Amino acid sequence: MRRTPAAERLSELGFPPRRGRQEPPFPLGVTRGWGGWPIEKRREGPRPVPFSERSPEDGREQPAHGSGILWRVRTRLSLCRDPEPPPPPPPLCLLRVSLLCALRAGGRGSRWGEDGAGLLLLPPAGASGSLKAERSSSTPYAGRMLENSGCKALKEGVLEKRSDGLLQLWKKKCCILTEEGLLLIPPKQLQQQQQQQQPGQGTAEPSQPSGPTVASLEPPVKLKELHFSNMKTVDCVERKGKYMYFTVVMTEGKEIDFRCPQDQGWNAEITLQMVQYKNRQAILAVKSTRQKQQHLVQQQPPQTQQIQPQPQPQIQPQPQPQIQPQPQPQPQPQPQPQPQPQPQQLHSYPHPHPHPYSHPHQHPHPHPHPHPHPHPHPYQLQHAHQPLHSQPQGHRLLRSTSNSA
């Protein structure tokens, strides 16, 4: 059985027969591109010439080239000259492409993803004017806020602070530098305040006395203040690319990383204001100590006048107790050794026993240590107790011993 070819089967199904290779028109009949410029299909080989541009000589030579030129001419969708360059694309296309590039860079998690997006997506001319208006509208609120607190804004701008989280992302903060510290405000809160301020300002412009009502409508701001009294140093200043990185070290030991464009020089301004604040505090401390010393000197003269009369009455009674102990030594000689001669008189009498050296002083004055020499014993006791009357008593003792002998 002979197999029918594919062309016959297609013709049986109702499809038209294929007449050589034919190219369809450029995609789905689209004749103009995104920016409005015409699409020109280019093929390899000699460029076909449209009928309107052909000369009679070209027409005579057409049969020599063959019938392929006809369908080539049919595929050309635009009748434009090649030497003319295509018109430049509008900026809208570039903006869309830049948006896609920025989203891709940020999605990959690159370090500079957010910066690239900020650089590529430039706002149009009208938007820049609106941003300036928003910035100018934000400054009065910051000024009023600082005036209420009694501070003066020395510098305002945007600083990027490294977050304390695990990812350590750079977050933009609206910073206000004052004479006493650095104020950090989240940008979202400022945007909300600006949005609430703008309708309030529109109603407040015709009538000036409604100013306090607008101030009362402003929501409270969540501020973070880095006071110079708690600030130790500004350290680790590094320049990488277009940014300057620096670290603020607090007295508690906490370190806060910041970065800013090199042209702004936030690190120099912060260090200068911190040094000036510390100098002012030192001068105030010296003045306060001097004032305290002056007050003490002024209070000292009345105190000396009160102290002087106090020692005078103390000096007068001092000689009186000195005079009283003078009669005391007079009664001291009163305890004279009057009872002592009584035992001596007892010793003066002769003992009835023939032995005169047998312990004559046991009863009145017992001696713990025995004397080796018995003869001088009575004389030593007599000299110790009563040296003035020892001689006559001694003679009596000698006489008594002689008589007994």
Swiss-Prot record:
The keyword Cell wall biogenesis/degradation does not apply. Residues 1-11, 54-63 have a biased composition (Basic and acidic residues). Residues 1-67, 189-217, 293-405 are annotated as: Disordered. GO terms for biological process: apoptotic process; positive regulation of apoptotic process. GO terms for molecular function: phosphatidylinositol phosphate binding. It comes from the Eukaryota. Widely expressed with very high levels in adult liver and high levels in adult lung. According to PubMed:10428057 expressed at low levels in liver. Expressed at increased levels in atherosclerotic lesions observed in hyperhomocysteinema. Residues 153-277 form the PH domain. It is found in: Cytoplasm; Cytoplasmic vesicle; Nucleus, Nucleolus. Residues 189-202, 294-309, 378-389 have a biased composition (Low complexity). Keywords: Apoptosis, Cytoplasm, Cytoplasmic vesicle, Nucleus, Repeat. The keyword Nucleus applies. Residues 354-377 are annotated as: 11 X 2 AA repeats of P-H. Its main location: cytoplasm. Residues 350-376 have a biased composition (Basic residues). Coiled coil: none annotated. Residues 309-344 are annotated as: 16 X 2 AA repeats of P-Q. One of its GO terms (cellular component) is cytoplasmic vesicle. Induction: Induced by IGF-I. Seems to be involved in regulation of apoptosis. May be involved in detachment-mediated programmed cell death. May mediate apoptosis during neuronal development. May be involved in regulation of anti-apoptotic effects of IGF1. Required for TCR-induced apoptosis and expression of TNFRSF6/FAS in a T-cell hybridoma cell line. May be involved in translational regulation. Interacts with RPL14, EIF3S7 and PABPC4. This is Pleckstrin homology-like domain family A member 1.
